A protein has these predicted regions:
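Hydrophobic/aromatic residues positioned on beta-strands within the core alpha/beta folds
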Residues: 103-106, 129
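Receiver (REC) domain switch/output surface
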Residues: 120, 136-149
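Short amphipathic alpha-helix used as the core "switch/output" element in two-component signaling
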Residues: 39-40, 58-62, 77, 82-101, ...
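Short hydrophobic/Thr-rich beta-strand motif most characteristic of the beta2 strand and flanking loop
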Residues: 42-57, 62
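Active-site beta3 strand of CheY-like receiver
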Residues: 66-78
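Conserved sequence signature across two-component system core domains
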Residues: 24-25, 53, 59, 72
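Signal-transmission linkers at sensory-effector interfaces
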Residues: 23, 150-173, 177
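Non-catalytic signal-transmission and effector/linker regions of two-component phosphorelay proteins
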Residues: 1-22, 29-49, 68
Length: 183
């Protein structure tokens, strides 16, 4: 059955694509260190593609341009004390993107209390920059990509089931009309 005109991803695209990781931080060194620490990272035959934003405003634009980003590593304090939180709010409420995994990184943990932030902003993880070693960064990226992959898989399955239900309804409706006409 052909249910949609949308092109299907080929096996080659799935196996050889990249995982988009948006790095949002006003410190260029954080971008450089993150890219270096994850330079050889690979998950399911895909490498990471880094997209850098240095402000909340720039991050919002990049979220619009890359709705398929898997992860955002998000600093809290940039041009304002809550710029990162505003980006998180934008991602979930305005962009309506519940797929992307948001990892909040802060150099000032007291600025945004972890418990409140996780609850109020639909953040997936919260890390202090000082505790985020290369190994911990690897771990959080790996677990976030697994979550993202599973969310996308569930969403695709749900969409497939919706198409089957619609097609079944159409087939049943056509069969019922034929049966009615035949008397």
């Amino acid at each position: 059955f052909l249910f949609s005109d949308e092109p299907e991803e080929t096996i080659d695209e799935i196996e050889h694509g990249t995982w988009k990781v948006l790095i949002v931080d006003d410190e260029p060194e954080v971008h450089a260190v993150t890219k270096l620490a994850l330079s050889d990272f690979e998950f399911q035959n895909k490498r990471l593609e880094f997209i850098s934003a240095y402000s909340g405003a720039e991050a919002k634009e990049l979220i619009k341009e890359h709705p398929d980003a898997a992860i955002v590593l998000l600093d809290v304090v940039m041009e304002t004390d809550d710029a990162g939180l505003q980006v998180a709010k934008f991602i979930r409420e305005e962009a309506k993107n519940n797929h992307i995994r948001i990892i909040l990184r802060t150099g000032q943990p007291g600025q945004a209390p972890e418990r409140q932030v996780i609850i109020n902003y639909d953040i997936n993880d919260y890390k202090s920059k000082t505790e985020l070693t290369a190994q911990k960064l690897f771990t959080v990226i790996m677990s976030s990509l697994r979550s993202y992959r599973d969310i996308i898989s569930i969403e695709q399955s749900r969409e497939g089931l919706e198409k089957i239900i619609i097609a079944s309804r159409d087939i049943f409706s056509a069969h019922s009309i034929e049966h009615f006409i035949e008397g």
